[in-house]
From Swiss-Prot:
<dbReference type="InterPro" id="IPR036043">
    <property type="entry name" value="Phosphoglycerate_kinase_sf"/>
</dbReference>
<feature type="binding site">
    <location>
        <begin position="353"/>
        <end position="356"/>
    </location>
    <ligand>
        <name>ATP</name>
    </ligand>
</feature>
<dbReference type="GO" id="GO:0004618">
    <property type="term" value="F:phosphoglycerate kinase activity"/>
</dbReference>
<feature type="binding site">
    <location>
        <position position="327"/>
    </location>
    <ligand>
        <name>ATP</name>
    </ligand>
</feature>
<dbReference type="GO" id="GO:0043531">
    <property type="term" value="F:ADP binding"/>
</dbReference>
<keyword id="KW-0547">Nucleotide-binding</keyword>
<dbReference type="InterPro" id="IPR015824">
    <property type="entry name" value="Phosphoglycerate_kinase_N"/>
</dbReference>
<feature type="binding site">
    <location>
        <position position="296"/>
    </location>
    <ligand>
        <name>ATP</name>
    </ligand>
</feature>
<dbReference type="InterPro" id="IPR015911">
    <property type="entry name" value="Phosphoglycerate_kinase_CS"/>
</dbReference>
<feature type="binding site">
    <location>
        <begin position="60"/>
        <end position="63"/>
    </location>
    <ligand>
        <name>substrate</name>
    </ligand>
</feature>
<keyword id="KW-0963">Cytoplasm</keyword>
<keyword id="KW-0418">Kinase</keyword>
<feature type="binding site">
    <location>
        <begin position="21"/>
        <end position="23"/>
    </location>
    <ligand>
        <name>substrate</name>
    </ligand>
</feature>
<dbReference type="InterPro" id="IPR001576">
    <property type="entry name" value="Phosphoglycerate_kinase"/>
</dbReference>
<keyword id="KW-0808">Transferase</keyword>
<dbReference type="Pfam" id="PF00162">
    <property type="entry name" value="PGK"/>
</dbReference>
<feature type="binding site">
    <location>
        <position position="205"/>
    </location>
    <ligand>
        <name>ATP</name>
    </ligand>
</feature>
Length: 396
């Protein structure tokens, strides 16, 4: 995939619009509780500042629905404040993203200054990829840079539509890194290539599994989706979560893996409880079958050892989806055990966004991984082999 990146452009004196992903979690006092996405955009922003660009940043935050208190609830003000601290320079926050007031702020921008536009989703035209809105945003800049991998799977005005109305466009360093690592893991991985796939539903991961069966040497399954596979094999799963309407599909996936000589590993023991609560008694079931009255809530110690061994032997490891209900302590060992094993591995370790990225962050192991994706849905669609609109418009 040939992407032109921001460092290939002369930015001096130019108005450079960078689409970032500052969709960050906030507490009740509207303080940023996790600034990972802001920090992920810093290399691109700092490059533009040092290249003497007039830097204009655009992002969304949450899902405003046009209610009167939305302006306060979904304002990017907390992100502007955190960015200012990280850059150690003032960040100007506009009170809108289009209009005469914004145009004046852009006109007054000096080289190396940073202007953050207010939440793009305050305008419903953003998500509709409205041509007029995209054109109006494009009038603010000479160069358009997309560095928002988290929204690259959305064809919105600022993530894709603007590209048609600017002469110069490029990918930021974050998108470059995402495409490079996810693309390498799926395109030309060093072997053995092991994938760990977890999460609640087989239905969420069908395309991912189909794509990985064509590429991986082994796939380790965890999370609640494992019980649908086990039941499809005729194994008793107690009251574990099962997608009854996906049993035939699970059988087909198992057959396909076997036909392609891909080792598809399922749990051989389980950590169970009577209900999915952290107050439930933690029962280790030392068998593939789960007794009636119990539900599987995490992979068991023997399974974790098997999966660890696969990680140790691998040259490339890709992980997407938790191994259990890791948000609750009694059921978190499998997920954090996998994270630990990947952190200690010399292999190319790629974590595909969402809950797995959150687990790696919580365990303080981000720096030990080769790449932790910033995009939940976007990384999933990339792994499914789908075209991402926000990247497609940058190709060539």
């Amino acid at each position: 995939m040939a992407l032109k990146t921001i460092d290939a452009l002369d930015l001096a004196g130019k108005r450079v619009f960078i689409r970032v992903d500052f969709n960050v979690p906030l507490d009740e006092q509207r303080r940023v509780t996790d600034d990972a996405r802001i920090r992920a955009a810093l290399p691109t922003i700092k490059h533009a500042i040092q290249a003497r660009a007039k830097v204009i940043l655009g992002s969304h935050l949450g899902r405003p629905k046009g209610k009167p208190d939305d302006r306060e609830k979904f304002s990017l003000e907390p992100a502007a404040q955190r960015l200012s601290e990280l850059l150690k320079q003032d960040v100007i926050l506009a009170d809108d993203c289009i209009g005469d007031g914004v145009k004046k702020l852009v006109r007054d921008l000096k080289e190396g200054q940073v202007l953050l536009l207010e939440n793009l989703r305050f305008h419903p035209q953003e998500e509709k990829n409205d041509e007029g809105f995209a054109r109006e945003l494009a009038t603010l800049c000479d160069v358009w840079v997309n560095d928002a991998f988290g929204t690259a799977h959305r064809a919105h005005a600022s993530t894709a539509g603007m590209a048609a109305f600017v002469k110069e466009k490029a990918a930021g360093f974050l998108i470059q890194k995402e495409v490079e690592y996810l693309g390498k893991a799926l395109g030309s991985p060093e072997r053995p290539f092991v994938a760990l796939i977890g999460g609640a539903k087989v239905s969420d991961k069908i395309k991912v599994l189909e794509n990985l069966i064509a590429k991986a040497d082994a796939i380790c399954i965890g999370g609640a989706m494992a019980y649908t596979f086990l039941k499809a094999q005729g194994v008793a799963v107690g009251k574990s979560l099962v997608e009854e309407d996906k049993l035939e599909l699970a059988r087909q996936i198992l057959e396909r893996a076997q036909a392609r000589k891909v080792d598809l590993l399922l749990p051989v023991d389980h950590v169970c409880g009577a209900e999915p609560k952290d107050t439930a008694e933690r029962v280790v079931v030392n068998d593939r079958a789960i007794p009636d009255g119990l539900m599987g809530l995490d992979i068991g110690p023997k399974t974790l050892d098997r999966y660890r061994q696969r990680i140790v032997d691998a040259k490339t490891v890709f992980w997407n989806g938790p191994m259990g209900l890791f948000e609750q302590k009694p059921w978190a060992e499998g997920t954090f055990g996998v994270a630990q094993a990947m952190a200690q591995s010399p292999a190319v370790t790629v974590v595909g966004g969402g809950d797995s990225a959150a687990a790696v962050e919580e365990a303080g192991l981000v720096s030990k991984m080769k790449h932790v994706s910033t995009g939940g849905g976007a990384s999933l669609e990339f792994i499914e082999g789908r075209v991402l609109p926000g990247i497609q418009v940058l190709e060539g």
